[in-house]
């Protein structure tokens, strides 16, 4: 099936999102719980419903608990000025990290957060003392779920995979679709329905980056 737009790869697993990517735009609008460490003048009206304690001068008082979209929280966060502090969403806290370490495959990641890996990677932008544990948990969760995802993509050809895919985060869904497309392309080639097997986009992009590095 052809796509209605040229897909732009997400940059959320790196230091910054790629705002040409629809996935990253959606992820950056997910809410993050924060606490104001200083009064925020002239913003009380904007956060009035979320912050019932807004003062009459339209300032958000110090100590207010808000839920801000990720992009705004990143923009306001400053280690030196301490404008706000970030509270970890429950899915990234120690209790859930313990669940992931026991068996990451039992968790419905899409229900907990459709951009689990990308959003978690962006949390490392903030100076949480749990950053090292979060990054390790993200890595081990991905490793623990990767084999099952790819095995299913290769062994569920022409079968109903909606129940499996419904539990995957958006990045995992992309991997699953890539696996199924690779299998489909191989079977078409095996039946003589394709003239050649082409390299995947991941391999092609890696070669381009490597060639660019050599030129530099």
From Swiss-Prot:
CDD domains: GINS_A_psf3, GINS_B_Psf3
Gene Ontology, cellular component aspect: CMG complex; GINS complex; nucleoplasm; nucleus
Residue ranges of coiled coil: none
GO annotation terms (biological process): cellular senescence; mitotic DNA replication initiation; multicellular organism growth
Localization (cell): Nucleus; Chromosome
Stored SUPFAM superfamilies: GINS helical bundle-like, PriA/YqbF domain
Stored Gene3D superfamilies: 1.20.58.2050
Keywords associated with the record: Chromosome, DNA replication, Nucleus
Region (Not essential for folding and stability of GINS complex, but may regulate accessibility to the central complex pore): 1-16
Family: Belongs to the GINS3/PSF3 family.
Assembly mode: Component of the GINS complex which is a heterotetramer of GINS1, GINS2, GINS3 and GINS4. Forms a stable subcomplex with GINS2. GINS complex interacts with DNA primase in vitro. Component of the CMG helicase complex, a hexameric ring of related MCM2-7 subunits stabilized by CDC45 and the tetrameric GINS complex.
Role noted for this protein: Required for correct functioning of the GINS complex, a complex that plays an essential role in the initiation of DNA replication, and progression of DNA replication forks. GINS complex is a core component of CDC45-MCM-GINS (CMG) helicase, the molecular machine that unwinds template DNA during replication, and around which the replisome is built.
Name of the protein in its database record: DNA replication complex GINS protein PSF3
Upper classification of the organism: Eukaryota, Metazoa, Chordata, Craniata, Vertebrata
